[in-house]
């Protein structure tokens, strides 16, 4: 687990980090979730929005791409539900000066050629190394990344993304992030 200070330092020095909810980042979120759980309001759109967007606001981000999953492998089962949630999240986030767009992705089948946490991590690493890129996963990665680049004013998004993957820089950045979190890809995966 990464502390809030380590997270900030990693973002400052390396430009990338990940962090989960903790006592410093949206401490009320776990309490809101437990209330949703005992009051049968897990599916409450306003509470879902409050949970997700409060963390994003606390992180201090300026732009956000939300990937709303829909289908039998997702929380949102219908396209209508996914659009309703996407619009609610986007409206709230934009009202807080976070430039936000959402996309909807189909979870009625796996995105890649494998499923299961370890297998999906392995596939993600292979993707970043440009060793194996399954079509559906490739399309979703390009859609999310091009939307994110567009939100920041970047042009030639497809070219930037392809270059990051084919040059190995996407994997190198991922590897730096893993190391900054005290992980070791060489010992853990893909020997």
Label the predicted regions:
Residues 12-14, 41-44, 48, 55-191:
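Well-ordered secondary-structure scaffolds
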């Amino acid at each position: 687990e990464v502390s809030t200070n380590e997270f900030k330092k990693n973002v400052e020095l390396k430009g990338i980090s990940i962090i989960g909810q903790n006592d410093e980042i949206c401490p009320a979120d776990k309490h809101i979730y437990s209330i949703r759980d005992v009051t049968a309001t897990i599916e409450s759109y306003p509470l879902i929005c409050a949970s997700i967007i409060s963390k994003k606001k606390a992180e201090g981000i300026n732009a956000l791409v939300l990937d709303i999953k829909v289908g039998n492998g997702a929380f949102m089962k219908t396209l209508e539900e996914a659009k309703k949630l996407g619009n609610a999240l986007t409206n709230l986030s934009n009202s807080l000066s976070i430039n936000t767009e959402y996309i909807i992705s189909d979870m009625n089948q796996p995105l890649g050629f494998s499923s299961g946490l370890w297998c999906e991590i392995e596939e993600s690493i292979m993707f970043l190394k440009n060793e194996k890129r399954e079509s559906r996963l490739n399309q979703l990665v390009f859609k999310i990344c091009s939307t994110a680049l567009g939100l920041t004013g970047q042009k030639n998004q497809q070219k930037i993304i392809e270059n990051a993957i084919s040059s190995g820089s996407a994997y190198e950045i991922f590897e730096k992030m893993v190391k900054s979190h005290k992980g070791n890809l060489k010992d853990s995966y893909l020997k």
